[in-house]
Amino acid sequence: MAPTGKRTGESTRSTGPAPPSSAGYLDGRLLIAMPVMGDARFERSVIYLCAHSAEGAMGIIVNHPAGSIDFPELLEQLGIIRKGEHIKLPENAESMKVLRGGPVDTGRGFVLHSSDFYIENATLRIDDGVCLTATVDILRAIANGSGPKHAILALGYAGWAPGQLETEIQSNGWLHCDADADLIFGDDVDEKYGRALRKIGIDPGMLSNEAGHA
């Protein structure tokens, strides 16, 4: 799960509020893209940081729908359910959105979920309320109703080389704020960007390329 130090976009293998660590690391917090970011892949992105250290950073975009596929269709493609069996899925599975998690490893699924579900040697506990699992076992569990209470599925992730995220933050490319369950797992993905900004006292309508960083 941990980043391996390649630049964003390169292929690699790799809640309660979480304040920045004493070393300034932001894992467990949300990044909010600023207009000066200049990278269309991250425009108006809200990213939950799963890992951040001297080795780099890794996160999941939580507000950009994948658009081309829904969760029941993905389960069919993986052979977890047969065609037409979506009517038997639990309500939270049938309506679960598939998100575009970032430009790295876009063919791989990453599930951010509440900490009531855990697979030994497969689940990364990020903080007391949020975990990350990237195996098909969690998809099977969600499909049969034994999965976590809250979850989102993202295809791909965002990754940063050592020091890259810090440089982008210093250049006003990102703001950051406390994460909460609604901003991570909420269904209103189109509203998350504005809500994250308002959480740190910024009116989205007043945001400009000259905005400073918090």
Swiss-Prot record:
Name the protein family.
Answer: Belongs to the UPF0301 (AlgH) family.
The protein depicted here goes by the name: UPF0301 protein blr1492
Cite the Pfam families for this sequence: DUF179
NCBIfam families membership? PRK00228.1-4
Intrachain S-S bonds: none
**PANTHER family documented for this protein:** UNCHARACTERIZED PROTEIN YQGE, UPF0301 PROTEIN YQGE
Any one cellular-component term (Gene Ontology): cytosol
Q: Which residues form the signal peptide?
A: none
